[in-house]
Amino acid sequence: MELPDPVRQRLSNLSLTVFGDSSRTGPESSDAADNEMVSSLALQMSLYFNSYFFPLWWVSCIVMLHLKYSILPDYYKFIVVTVVILITLIEAIRLYLGCMGNLQEKVPELAGFWLLSLLLQLPLILFLLLNDGLRNLPLEKAIHIIFTIFLTFQVISAFLTLKKMVNQLAARFHLQDFDQLSSSSAAVRRVRQCTEEL
């Protein structure tokens, strides 16, 4: 299952704008730039452990919500149920995009993972953790803190991985451009030699 082309293109453009290294004027002088793996082992391990932690988080959230549902005000009942549903849906998409983007070194997928983590998931979990009106139980605070640590680490490591990926793609592009330029100049030299012989 791939992202639609317009979404991939927009995420690629956003990634180049946000993560591109504008201080560089040319490609890095690395002979192994084409073969270097830039996916992050730390990010992948975090995603792996997060995929096992999330069902535990979800079950404990539902159990704690069931225990305190009767003492919550009506508006908080609606808000908490909505937030848990949103977190569940976003987390499934987020983990998929993170794994695909990191393992296959796809910048748009990893950028989507980073944006979902930073702009949606982190604020929602911080709302559940820091809102006093929700009357959090000790187990809830503990699981929300662990989830927040996972998210914070993933946001930071995804940013660093995206920066490396974008810089490597830019270096590959510049090397391909240079190769095309050198091959076209070789063709011009051959044409000149042929015309001189005539």
UniProtKB/Swiss-Prot annotation:
Protein's membrane topology: Multi-pass membrane protein
Record-given protein name: Transmembrane protein 17
Chain's role: Transmembrane component of the tectonic-like complex, a complex localized at the transition zone of primary cilia and acting as a barrier that prevents diffusion of transmembrane proteins between the cilia and plasma membranes. Required for ciliogenesis and sonic hedgehog/SHH signaling.
Lineage: Eukaryota, Metazoa, Chordata, Craniata, Vertebrata
Superkingdom of source: Eukaryota
Keyword Cytoplasm applies: no
Name of one Pfam family that matches: Transmemb_17
Residue intervals passing through the bilayer: 47-67, 78-98, 110-130, 142-162
Organism in which the protein naturally occurs: Mus musculus (Mouse)
Main subcellular location: membrane
Family: Belongs to the TMEM17 family.
Entry annotated with the keyword Glycoprotein: yes
Gene name, Swiss-Prot/TrEMBL: Tmem17
